[in-house]
């Protein structure tokens, strides 16, 4: 607002000067003249009475003002950087979950002998549980048997006892030098039981994948609370993460189907 100027009584009593040509509005035929813009004139003054004067002011009040903080939109580069870190970590963990499922499937025996059948066997060796493969060499001389040769022959009986207790459906025999494990043909009922075991292991893997996805979503939500991502950003990133989750779910289903086919093969 331009400053107010006080003038003398004599000046106030003087007749007002005519508006300059710049302040006049040109006349046009058929048009109503507009009001002259006297507020913009350099000769515009406010006449005040002589004597003490006081000026009052009030604070400016903005109507309908929005006091909420405005979220700065993240750049594409920032969004991609956050996505890369979180999604890469999720993929890495999901890959490990797939490996775990595959290793668990390998322990489920089919109609053929496979050293992986004994991967979960742990022997109480000198008071400490150790994996069988760390204290013995395991070979496959033929399709129906395994040959276990311990590095310490004193552990033969302990290994034999542990294999029997594992209830793998195999028959170990100890000749004092090695342990021969005979893998009998699978019966129809046994195949069905093993198929259920495979389905259970697959579901455990899917649960692990879902938990990994949940952790990644929590990481995105944390960035939203920190004002580093918007709600729309999180929705888009969550949708991309769901595609990754679906991808690994299909991988589990594929290896599960493959294992079930091996079980049903006679």
Swiss-Prot record:
GO molecular function: ribosomal large subunit binding
GO cellular component: chloroplast
Cross-referenced CDD domains: RRF
Biased composition regions of type Low complexity, renumbered to the chain: 1-26
Localization per Swiss-Prot or TrEMBL: Plastid, Chloroplast
Superkingdom, taxonomy of origin: Eukaryota
Claim: Hydrolase is one of the keywords in the record: no
Transit peptide location on this chain: 1-74
Major localisation: plastid
InterPro entries: Ribosome_recyc_fac, Ribosome_recyc_fac_dom, RRF_sf
Matches recorded under Gene3D superfamilies: 3.30.1360.40, Ribosome-recycling factor
Statement: the UniProt record of this protein carries the keyword Mitochondrion: no
Region annotation (Disordered) ranges: 1-30
NCBIfam families reported for this sequence: frr (TIGR00496)
PANTHER family: MITOCHONDRIAL RIBOSOME RECYCLING FACTOR PSEUDO 1, RIBOSOME RECYCLING FACTOR
Family of this protein: Belongs to the RRF family.
Function: Responsible for the release of ribosomes from messenger RNA at the termination of chloroplastic protein biosynthesis.
Name of the protein this chain belongs to: Ribosome-recycling factor, chloroplastic
